[in-house]
């Protein structure tokens, strides 16, 4: 198991290393399909864990030898965004699990930010004015990515 923890979150190492056992209380589950996204509380802080399910065999080989895992890339992109002044959830850690020498499962952990979900702008739970503001913020964010040559 490869565990990379941002030095700022070293105090949470025991919680982070226990994530693959999934023996923690989930505060909220946002997505539970191919990948799982859930909010958890470790100590005094809320975090988001994204678990990347086992990829197809060819991708297991690619992530083992040729390409960084999605978890590692998510961590590195979050660091890059913050360095470029693009607001995003601070990256906390990533975990890569190998079985029989091959990549199997990845986890990306970030701080939880209490913002509305992008998917909320398509549902009926928000007032129309709030949906409009969220769509505007999404366009501004995308523009910021372009101006910083990220997209």
Annotated model-derived regions:
Residues 4-8, 15, 104, 136, ...:
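Histidine (H) residue identity feature
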Residues 118-127:
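AlphaC helix of the protein kinase catalytic domain
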